[in-house]
Amino acid sequence: MQTYSTPLTLIIVTSLFLFTTQGSSSNAVEPTKKPLKLANYRATCEDRTRTLVTRLNTSHHSVVWQRYDIYSRYMRRMPPLCIITDAYKETTHQGGATFTCTRQNLTLYNLTVKDTGVYLLQDQYTGDVEAFYLIIHPRSFCRALETRRCFYPGPGRVVVTDSQEADRAIISDLKRQWSGLSLHCAWVSGLMIFVGALVICFLRSQRIGEQDAEQLRTDLDTEPLLLTVDGDLE
């Protein structure tokens, strides 16, 4: 009896440990390495309200709304936002955002950029899943869209969002481009003048050489032939 008590105790302790580990890991945040197949893409701005509406028929079914964080190396499955079983509507909070869930839609309030992610609806009765890829843009980006001057590069690669700053950036950019073009034209013009001066000097030197040779030939043709006779006088 004592021979089997130690292995039996070991088996019981190991089983309890595995059961406890599985139970605690099911409630923890679990990373997933497999990307989700996304069909729906949505976008909104910070501090706005956005509603995600499912196309699945989830009437009278238990559903789960869940969020996947995409800022980590792998998409992390966060704790469920809402689990709708008997209640028609449920409101919950995660971070600074507020979520109101029903079987058909998920409404998000007070969003920030950190709430960007994949929002998943799973029908627990049929097993159907629908994913929404929700992008939350910062306020500066949305203000830039409203002024219709978004993503204009200002000094130091800064995105200019204010209209007056954008006007100043456009003017300074045009001045910079014009000065660069003027400098380039001046450099090309100077180079062409220098090359032209060299060509003119070369041609003039050749012409002067030819004139000197012609003058020398002319002088040789017109110069009288002088004969000197040396002799003794008696």
UniProtKB/Swiss-Prot annotation:
This protein's record includes keyword Cell membrane: no
Cellular component terms (Gene Ontology): host cell membrane; plasma membrane; viral envelope
Subcellular compartments: Host membrane
Name of this protein: Membrane glycoprotein RL11
Membrane topology (UniProt): Single-pass type I membrane protein
Ranges annotated as spanning the membrane: 183-203
Source species of the chain: Human cytomegalovirus (strain Merlin)
Signal peptide: 1-23
Record keywords: Host membrane, Membrane, Signal, Transmembrane, Transmembrane helix
